[in-house]
A protein has these predicted regions:
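Short beta-strand/loop motif that positions the catalytic acidic residue
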Residues: 281, 287-289
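Conserved alpha/beta-hydrolase "acid-adjacent" motif
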Residues: 294-300
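Short beta-strand element of the alpha/beta-hydrolase
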Residues: 62-71
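Alpha/beta-hydrolase active-site loop
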Residues: 118-139
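Accessory cap/linker subdomain of secreted extracellular hydrolases
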Residues: 174-280
Length: 365
């Protein structure tokens, strides 16, 4: 028998699924023969200082470099979740293969200044530009060979930066979105619900409820009007919700739902159209997705990366779906988020080899 799910309670849970797996302490990782330097750099536009780590191969010289851009959530420089530090693993792998790697705490996280809660993807893109500007001052970095590796929202941020930065040598998108934000979330909701065994009727009801809320966000750009319309909408679908927590009043419940969907990041994401930026990218692009990614679906996003770039005249694009990998590029049984912390693997060696081989080939053409 398939499960049923309540429409309204599903809305708020679903909206936060992308960024709710960053908590927890990580296990100590082995060190490798690399040179790592703690770095503080300035985002002059927003007047904040950001903190990161620059890792270099353990030898003298000038090196090609990559900036690692994390996905949604309060991520530190290692994109830490549970016992895992995937960006540390990626950094170690890439430095052993001759790349300098720059990773940093998101604004308002770790040692970085700034307000995380009020920031959106464009703000995070400014932070990446600041990281790029810092690398351009380094004598040990090949200024013409600096690329971006973005995971999830980080892939979206990479497209924003590269669309207006001619000195980006390449982009690697790791489960980065190429379709509109509202569609990303609707596809995500449906895929997760099906994998959890929910019945088709409940899925359809939830899809319509979420789509209605998303359309309000896209239609009304005045903040006061938007909030008024959203409150009215949520009141309509929450009034008879049997899953309302007993310790919350009806008004508190509605307010929690409205607050969730009207967070600055969420509003920006729902209105965001990646194509507006991807079509301006002129550098080589590698787009990777796992076949068991239930958050940014490979079949919906990989073909769009290729279509948009080629239609805009950039034929230097490679797309690849990697078998059995989830949204975090772990080898997975189901792809469900509940597995993320339970899997021993932090980041698939197959995925690391795939992007490293492509980067070496791209820079040596």
């Amino acid at each position: 028998m398939k499960k049923r799910i309540n429409t309204t309670s599903f809305l708020i849970c679903f909206l936060f699924i992308i960024g709710c797996y960053q908590e927890g302490k990580a296990k100590k990782q082995p060190s490798f023969d690399t040179i790592s330097e703690n770095v503080y750099f300035k985002n002059a536009k927003d007047n904040i200082t950001l903190a990161g780590t620059l890792s270099l191969p353990g030898k003298r010289g000038r090196f090609p470099a990559v900036i690692l851009i994390s996905g949604n959530g309060k991520n530190n420089r290692n994109e830490e979740f549970g016992s895992h530090k995937p960006f540390l693993d990626v950094s170690n792998y890439l430095t052993r293969n001759g790349f300098a790697v720059f990773r940093f705490d998101k604004r308002g996280v770790g040692e970085s200044e700034g307000d995380f809660d009020s920031a959106n993807s464009f703000d995070f893109a400014e932070d990446v530009r600041a990281a790029l500007n810092y690398l351009l001052t380094r004598k040990d970095i090949q200024k013409n060979n600096i690329g971006l590796i973005g995971h999830s929202e980080g892939g979206l941020i990479a497209s924003i930066v590269a669309s207006s930065s001619p000195n980006i040598a390449f982009i690697v998108s790791l489960a980065g979105p190429s379709i509109a934000g509202d569609k990303i979330l609707l596809h995500q909701q449906k895929a997760l619900a099906k994998m959890r065994g929910l019945d088709d009727s409940s899925i359809e009801i939830s899809q319509k409820a979420n789509q209605g809320a998303f359309e309000i966000v896209k239609k009304y750009t005045n903040d006061l009007v938007l909030k008024s319309k959203m409150v009215e909408y949520i009141q309509g679908i929450a009034r008879n919700d049997p899953d309302k927590p007993k310790n919350m009043t009806y008004d508190e419940y509605v307010n929690a739902q409205v607050t969730g969907i009207l967070k600055p990041w969420m509003v920006n994401f729902l209105r965001f159209k990646p194509e507006d930026y991807i079509k301006h990218i002129k550098c080589p692009v590698l787009a990777l997705n796992g076949s068991k990614d239930l958050q940014v679906l490979a079949k919906e996003n990989l073909p769009e990366w290729e279509r948009i770039l080629k239609e805009s005249g950039n034929t230097n694009v490679t797309i690849k779906e990697l078998p059995n990998l989830n949204h975090l590029f772990q080898t997975s049984n189901t792809g469900l988020p509940k597995e993320y912390k339970e899997i021993n693997e932090s980041f698939s060696p197959i995925a690391m080899k795939e992007m490293t081989s492509w980067m070496k080939y791209t820079l040596n053409r």
